Amino acid sequence: MDSYKKVLATGKQVAFVIKKGALTFDEKISYKNSFTMRREDVLRKIIDVAAQDFIIATTGKTGRELFELREANGQNHAHDFLTVGSMGHCSSIALGLALNHPEKTFWCVDGDGALIMHMGALAVIGAAKPQNLIHVVINNGAHESVGGMPTAAANIDLTGIARACGYPEVFKATNFDELENYLQLAKAAKKLTFIEVECAIGSRKDLGRPTTTPAENKLKFMEALNDSQI
């Protein structure tokens, strides 16, 4: 570790290549918040209300949990687009889909860290106002998929920002009764809707990863999207 400082001092760059398993987590640092809803349970509610609508999920554990919930329900994944490795882009992808397929309804399931990374998308979405897009932000105030470090979400008003960007319907769910109500309202409203969901930090220890490739996911999603029977 000391040797790289000498290299940097010469104006050169340094890259570390670390083998999987070389680093361990001693659990001395624990990130928590005061929220009670689990993300996986929130996703389960969204799946129930969305039914045959299309879901665009942000990168990380959100997409992984969505995939496993579909597996547990015996459902296929054709109506889900998993934004693997493209943090912050799911809202823009959802906007493009909503504008090009006004006859279908799209649910963008975002995260607070991802939203902040590309917050400019809110202004573009708010200006376009697609009536068939529901933007759900699961806010746990953390970059949980990469260790749980805090985001800036605790210091900003996400619903206020969405409202200022032109979202006509804005809600904030702090418990499951509110969540169920707001999801149903969004489904029926036929208006661009923003829902912030306060969520606890944490996931199952045995949480797996998608067993299909991103390319396979994309092709199945495109087939379902263009199926005239859907």
Residue positions per predicted region:
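Catalytic donor nucleotide-activated moiety binding site of glycosyltransferases and closely related
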Residues: 54-73
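Extended, hydrophobic interaction surfaces within ordered domains
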Residues: 1-17, 21-22
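Active-site pocket-lining segments that scaffold enzyme catalytic pockets across diverse folds
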Residues: 16-22, 26-58
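Glycine-rich beta-alpha junction loops
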Residues: 18-24, 59-63, 140-142, 198-203
